[in-house]
């Protein structure tokens, strides 16, 4: 290869530099993110607030801690810039830039729960055996066994003390309770024959007689039938136990601490010595009757009990009645007899049979009670939605009024497999919550308002020079307006009636009715009817809110109200506390908020949906009437006279022109007829005189 060929093949150095320049220029302009476009809705950003800077500093500090980087001013600045860059570069969802309208919304039956408190009405608890446990019976529970025991972590608030069962502060403690009936006997040595039932119940305080709250509890004595003074007598059939509610002579205190004072007026039967006419060495000289400790042990350890004494055995506080605890401090609430049905089902009940015999020892009467048990009855108690049971390590914090539980289980039924190392918290579905929501358009009560607004934007803003075009299509516009208004009113009505009820029923079934679908074949049962009444009562309250509120037309599952959300008045922390169910001085004032929203709804209910928009259409069309343009001009008599003369002159001119046009038309018609006659003559003018020719032509 000669030097000339090498020079020809080697690219010139200057050309290489010239080809690299455009690439460098393009690399400088290349970006990895999408091109940012300024939209019409884009607004100028406001300067950052102190709260935003404080939050940015916290995020930067947390980032440096996670990355184990020393916190210096330079690193803090770089971390803050990185966070701002990441937030700004996040993709914005469609329509988010235009979501500048925030209103209060009422969401009925959200997927949230709250604790049932002592101030709530009693809960329906169903049992599978009403012979041994009084109450409504239902042996079909749980409806969804595969869903029992689902794990959940809760952190909810409360205002009144919550209902909790178990060995924990703020919960009612479990204990064994006995109920005794007397069976007639004819044996000469047998004084009495007994049937006794033992089961789990609610544990009273040991020193309840000395407690200062006992005297105060006397004023809360319920109005009911007093308990009998004799042991109830029943037949020899051990499978029959008749429960009869009664009020004991004294109340027992189940709880008296910072969580409140809980009392119970049901009888607490137990064996003790009858010391009537005996010496002071009788054990009943104690202030508190001697309780048989053996009977309060585990129900599975002993199947035979023997009580022996030189003093007669008596059964105190007669009556076959279930516990009915109620709160009396710091507030007074209703009785809750359903709680005992949950505790008694946590372990099988044991049935005892025995008698009391009288013997002689050392020339003294000797009394012996023999009790034997060979029968146990397993039980199951269940609740139905909207109620559920949270089982686990429940912690109640009275200072912050919060309830927490990690790795808890959601149940609807309790049976003999329950472990009392856990606690039971009774919860229910939230009836509704108030939350602020954002919309990409202003609040509208009816779709007719939205449709007519769009129509008016394209019609009423036109110039008056299009008056003749508007008149040509005026009937079409009226038809569109009427159709839109009718459709808006119809859709508004359907949202609050058929569609809303259908969506509400579907959503509520998916959320809370998944475990308890009412069986149509057994719908005539009383218990199903009672539960349905409770279930529908909450729905009626929700519907009552919907009828009182004016909602946005484009929502059906919840109601967006016309009340604008004011962040300065209700900050998000208040909303968060409301969602947690906490009610304190810092919580959202729901009653005040409801009054404001109802007032705003009343203002919008004064007009039928679409009436305001239709009135705007009528005013706009009236402005396009040409008569109104000169209405203000013809306000004087002289101007009116001039206008009349001008109109008469124009009319005269039109008449003169019409007459002239008519004469010209007649002349042209005659000439055409003459020409037609002359063209039809075959011989022309031969044989006729000149006079005739002249006359003919002149015609």
Curated annotation (Swiss-Prot):
Residues 654-699 are cytoplasmic. GO terms for molecular function: structural molecule activity. Residues 90-632 are extracellular. Residues 1-47 are annotated as: Disordered. The keyword Transmembrane helix applies. GO terms for cellular component: plasma membrane. Specific enzymatic cleavages in vivo yield the mature SU and TM proteins. Glycans are attached at residues 100, 128, 153, 274, 355, 372, 461, 507, 554, 566, 585. InterPro entries: GP41-like, HERV-K_env, Retroviral_env_glycoprotein. Residues 10-20 have a biased composition (Basic residues). The record marks 465-466 as: Cleavage. Residues 1-89 form the signal peptide. Keywords: Cell membrane, Cleavage on pair of basic residues, Disulfide bond, ERV, Glycoprotein, Membrane, Signal, Transmembrane, Transmembrane helix, Transposable element, Viral envelope protein, Virion. Residues 466-486 are annotated as: Fusion peptide. The chain crosses the membrane at residues 633-653. Expressed in testis, and peripheral blood lymphocytes. The surface (SU) and transmembrane (TM) proteins form a heterodimer. SU and TM are attached by noncovalent interactions or by a labile interchain disulfide bond. PANTHER family: ENDOGENOUS RETROVIRUS GROUP K MEMBER 113 ENV POLYPROTEIN-RELATED. Retroviral envelope proteins mediate receptor recognition and membrane fusion during early infection. Endogenous envelope proteins may have kept, lost or modified their original function during evolution. This endogenous envelope protein has lost its original fusogenic properties. Two human-specific proviruses are inserted as tandem repeats with a shared LTR in most individuals tested. The telomeric copy is referred here as 'provirus 41574'. The centromeric copy is referred here as 'provirus 41575'. Belongs to the beta type-B retroviral envelope protein family. HERV class-II K(HML-2) env subfamily. This is Endogenous retrovirus group K member 6 Env polyprotein.
